[in-house]
Design a protein with these regions (language model features):
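A short, cysteine/histidine-rich metal-binding "knuckle" motif
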Residues: 1-25
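Nudix hydrolase/Nudix homology domain
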Residues: 9, 18, 71, 83, ...
């Protein structure tokens, strides 16, 4: 029997990821805990920023705006690192245990980095040509982030997974929880749509779950995924989320506000899902 082509992005059959017309999709769970009439939500902080990750992978065009878009997302330390260290060191620290899976990207990324570090790229400034090197572009960045982005646990689907299956697996990998620690609510998932700094369209699909009592939220030394992908995990109130979410993540806050309104309605009407 002929095996059907599976799209790892949308989960449909008949085409592959690069031919998918949907936004780039991630799947996850927004999990809440209620204590003293206050809702708190599980958020995770990445090990590296999205801008830094895309830069190390060479996911940019050889022009100022494309590179600066990524640099502006980076932490202060990441900006220092891309100027200070060779790509091999940065690459190995980024991927840790899975670096061989992305080795095909390494040479292309190294070629780009050599160009912008050594030769620079030609840009027009008020009609005058100038050569900008990476160090010049980093100097143009005025962001001063200390930590990588916070967000809800999520990730990409695996082979033959539907939305719910992928959401559960990603959530459990990132939180180190299992089905005995939370209860999925019988609600339609909430959708977060946005356009990234790379001008691509993204869609995050979140199911809603309730954290069961007495469950601890913490990083585990025995969880390889957490050790290599995350730098922190916390239960946050809405005010905490507002304080920690980056200013350009307005869509994420809108999704959270929608979830809170739904939870309040369920509580007020004593609806148990």
């Amino acid at each position: 029997m002929e095996q059907k082509t599976f799209c790892y992005n949308c989960g449909n059959y008949g085409h592959i990821f690069k031919n998918c017309h949907y936004p780039i999709i991630s799947l996850g769970i927004i999990c809440y805990h209620k204590l003293n009439d206050e809702y708190k939500f599980i958020l995770v902080r990445r090990k590296d920023t999205l801008g830094y990750t895309d830069f190390i992978r060479g996911k940019y065009l050889l022009n100022k705006d494309s590179i600066l878009n990524l640099v502006n997302i980076m932490t202060i330390k990441e900006k220092e690192n891309i100027l200070k260290y060779d790509l091999k060191k940065l690459w190995d620290e980024l991927w840790t245990i899975s670096k061989d899976e992305h080795i095909d990207e390494f040479e292309k990324s190294k070629e780009k980095l050599d160009i912008i570090r050594n030769n620079g790229i030609e840009e027009q400034n008020n009609g005058i040509k100038e050569q900008l090197k990476l160090v010049d572009i980093v100097k143009l960045s005025n962001t001063k982030y200390q930590d990588p982005e916070w967000g809800f646990p999520k990730g990409k689907r695996e082979k033959d997974e539907n939305n719910l299956e992928g959401s559960i697996r990603e959530f459990e990998e990132e939180t180190n929880l299992n089905k005995d620690h939370y209860k999925l609510l019988n609600l339609k998932p909430v959708i977060e749509n946005y356009i990234g700094s790379n001008t691509k369209k993204y869609r995050h699909i979140y199911y809603i779950a309730k954290l069961l009592p007495e469950v601890k939220i913490e990083l585990s030394e025995n969880n390889i995924f957490q050790k290599t992908e995350l730098s922190s995990i916390q239960l946050m109130s809405y005010e905490d989320v507002v304080e920690n979410i980056r200013p350009y993540n307005k869509e994420k806050l809108a999704v959270l506000e929608s979830v809170i309104e739904t939870l309040k309605y369920l509580d007020e009407h004593k609806i148990d899902l």
